[in-house]
């Protein structure tokens, strides 16, 4: 950990992002006061791309009433053009809206999940796609069955033009609301400078979301949600589920 810190936590990997009413000159003055004395250093290149993922299933003993499951797979990296397709897929499957596929299937129709969400996290050379569900232990087998049923729908059923447009419109709306928060905007700008070296206008992001086709969604679903490549971790009171 210390070696990683010393290698990567260097000035060339630092971005100061500010969203405020302060004049730019004041922001620079404050930054120089706190960071101006740090010696100049560059990160040492040499990270090896992640390889060797092997799907696996594990059940862990967990002495609680509620059971937990995480299902996931490796996914697109931060520079993969398919990241917009998987972001849209993720939002439809288990995003924050009440109309996500998993929320409707497990909570609205069956009432068997306390917590339910899916996540996509891209990194520099790989990515992570995951689904989390918390439910009563007796309901967990059914919850897992329903999750896989919804994943199968994404792999096998092409989205209609109207459903695709609705999903794109919803994702763009969520993005518009998120950047109304100065903190969210500040963090997004800093991350984009670190990862891409630029900050794209929100209109460009909208354009890329709108460019995702039903075929793109079908392709990324079959790649990322392939049953043979999914790993699963269960926490419950039983040794078998």
Pin down the residues of each PLM region.
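Active-site palm subdomain of RNA-directed nucleic acid polymerases
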Residues: 101, 106
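Charge-rich, well-structured scaffold segments of protease-associated domains
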Residues: 1-43, 69, 76, 94-96, ...
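His/Glu-based metal-binding/catalytic segments typifying zinc-dependent metallopeptidases
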Residues: 43-99
């Amino acid at each position: 950990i210390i070696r990683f810190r010393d290698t990567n936590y260097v000035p060339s990997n630092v971005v100061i992002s500010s969203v405020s009413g302060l004049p730019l000159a004041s922001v620079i003055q404050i930054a120089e006061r706190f960071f101006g004395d740090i010696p100049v250093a560059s990160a040492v290149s040499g990270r090896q791309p992640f390889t060797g993922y092997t799907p696996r299933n594990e059940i862990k003993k967990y002495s609680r009433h509620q059971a937990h499951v995480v299902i996931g797979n490796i996914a697109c990296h931060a520079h993969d053009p398919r990241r917009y397709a998987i972001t849209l897929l993720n939002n439809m499957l288990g995003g924050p809206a009440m109309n996500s596929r998993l929320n409707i299937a497990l909570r609205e129709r069956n009432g068997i999940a306390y917590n339910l969400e899916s996540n996509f996290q891209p990194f520099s050379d790989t990515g992570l796609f995951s689904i989390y569900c918390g439910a009563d232990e007796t309901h967990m087998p059914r919850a897992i069955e329903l999750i896989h049923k919804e994943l199968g729908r994404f792999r096998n059923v092409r989205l209609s033009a109207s459903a695709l447009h609705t999903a794109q419109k919803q994702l763009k709306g969520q993005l518009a609301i998120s950047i109304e928060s100065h903190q969210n905007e500040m963090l997004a700008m800093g991350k984009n400078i670190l990862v891409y070296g630029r900050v794209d206008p929100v209109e460009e992001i909208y354009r890329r979301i709108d460019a995702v086709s039903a075929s793109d969604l079908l392709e990324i679903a079959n790649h990322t949600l392939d049953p043979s490549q999914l790993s699963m971790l269960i926490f419950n009171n039983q040794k078998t589920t």
